[in-house]
UniProtKB/Swiss-Prot annotation:
Source species: Theileria annulata
UniProt record similarity statement: Belongs to the cytochrome c family.
Phylogenetic classification of the source organism: Eukaryota, Sar, Alveolata, Apicomplexa, Aconoidasida
GO cellular component: mitochondrial intermembrane space
Main location: mitochondrion
UniProt name for this protein: Cytochrome c
Pfam families per the UniProt record, alphabetical: Cytochrom_C (PF00034)
Post-translational modification: Binds 1 heme c group covalently per subunit.
InterPro entries named among the record's database cross-references: Cyt_c-like_dom, Cyt_c-like_dom_sf, Cyt_c_1A/1B
PANTHER family: CYTOCHROME C
């Protein structure tokens, strides 16, 4: 069963600040450029608006069966605690607790994953 989109308001984010967060918190496991390599985690290019677990990567069944289509609202809640939002995910990231950090990272991810 698909996870419904959360009823949250996502603050405006700053992509430049999000880029710094990506570099310090995400880049060790993810790339985000077209044709980028798969590391411990999948390349995130083009993931925004796509169904979770649907690219060429060995996703967990939890990700593949979540029914999530990545949006601001899903990412905003997911990034607090990935393992709580999708129990069984392979994502080992502990999460970002600050709302503005999540908003900044989302702004960057949306921008960078479409270039």
């Amino acid at each position: 069963m698909a996870k419904p989109e959360p009823d949250v308001v996502v603050p405006e984010g700053d992509p430049a600040k999000g880029a710094k967060l990506f570099k310090s918190k995400c880049a060790q496991c993810h790339t985000i450029n077209k044709g980028g390599s798969v590391k411990q985690g999948p390349n995130l290019f083009g993931f925004y608006g796509r169904k979770s677990g649907s690219t060429d990567y060995a996703y967990s069944d939890a990700n593949k069966n979540s029914g999530i289509v990545w949006s601001d609202k899903h990412l905003f809640v997911y990034l607090v605690n990935p393992k709580q939002y999708i129990p069984g995910t392979k994502m080992v990231f502990a999460g970002l607790k600050k709302e503005q950090d999540r908003a900044d990272l989302i702004a960057y991810l949306k921008e960078a994953s479409s270039k």
